[in-house]
Amino acid sequence: MKILCSFVIALLCGGSSLSAAQQWKDTIVVARDGSGDYRTLTEAMEGIRAFMDYKVTVLVKKGVYKEKVILPSWLENVDFIGENAENTIITYDDHANINKMGTFRTYTLKVEGNSITFKNLTIENNAARLGQAVALHSEG
């Protein structure tokens, strides 16, 4: 009975650690149409473990992603790869004259983490000509 109980406990513990390992993917797909793991880049970041020691690839399907994105300092070792730069666009429209936010807060995408790369996509600030604006703000 003691051996059976130990076996059941070991099986349950092993099963829960396997579930935790399966929770963190090394490839994530973002697609506006819902065909991927996430619909937005912001949602995808929630699916990436903090301070990873392995590389994660985020495949971004073509589409226009209108969102203000912050990649926090705990997000490291991530490659964002778009389908192509002409049709995979991350955009927002803040500018310096909105609520006196100043130029440095107008970014579309802010990178605070290290070892973050972007390939085959466009990052733009689509603000009207009402004030200065930043597309990419990098601190990492």
What does each of the following model-derived ranges do?
Residues 39-50, 66-74, 80:
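Short, T/G/N/S-enriched strand-turn elements that build extracellular solenoid repeat scaffolds
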Residues 63-67, 85-87:
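Short active-site-proximal "capping" loops at secondary-structure junctions
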Residues 71-72, 128-130, 137-140:
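Low-complexity, polar/charged sequence tracts that form flexible coils or short amphipathic helices
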